Amino acid sequence: MATINQLVRKPRIKLVVKSNVPALEACPQKRGVCTRVYTTTPKKPNSALRKVCRVRLTNGFEVTSYIGGEGHNLQEHSVVLIRGGRVKDLPGVRYHTVRGALDCAGVKDRKQARSKYGVKRPKA
């Protein structure tokens, strides 16, 4: 235990927590415009063509965002909503596009986990 005199001379340092999603600036989501929509390949043990897009956010940041689900309607100049959440096998991809918001349509014919892919409840 440090004495009061020691603490006066050298105070306890606060732990600085670094954000995993700095471009969001402590917001839950941010809006942006797609500057490039393309596919990329994942890291070593995995193999696929992952759909990603480069997004210029309203705060000026340019980030890479993953497009989840099967099939999408995004192209250059599409307005999308970005949330945090990295993709483990894609280096540098720390954001996800929100399906079913703004210009990004929900996943077609999705029956399970619909809320994650912006799909309304089907008519029974």
Swiss-Prot record:
Organism: Aeromonas hydrophila subsp. hydrophila (strain ATCC 7966 / DSM 30187 / BCRC 13018 / CCUG 14551 / JCM 1027 / KCTC 2358 / NCIMB 9240 / NCTC 8049)
Underlying gene: rpsL
Keyword Lipoprotein: no
Oligomer status and interactors: Part of the 30S ribosomal subunit. Contacts proteins S8 and S17. May interact with IF1 in the 30S initiation complex.
Modified residues (3-methylthioaspartic acid): 89
Taxonomy of the source species: Bacteria, Pseudomonadati, Pseudomonadota, Gammaproteobacteria, Aeromonadales
GO cellular component terms listed in the entry, alphabetical order: small ribosomal subunit
Keyword line: Methylation, Ribonucleoprotein, Ribosomal protein, RNA-binding, rRNA-binding, tRNA-binding
GO process terms (BP): translation
Family that this chain belongs to: Belongs to the universal ribosomal protein uS12 family.
Pfam families, alphabetized: Ribosom_S12_S23
Function of the molecule: With S4 and S5 plays an important role in translational accuracy.
Record InterPro entries: NA-bd_OB-fold, Ribosomal_uS12, Ribosomal_uS12_bac
A GO molecular function held by the record: rRNA binding
Protein name per the record: Small ribosomal subunit protein uS12
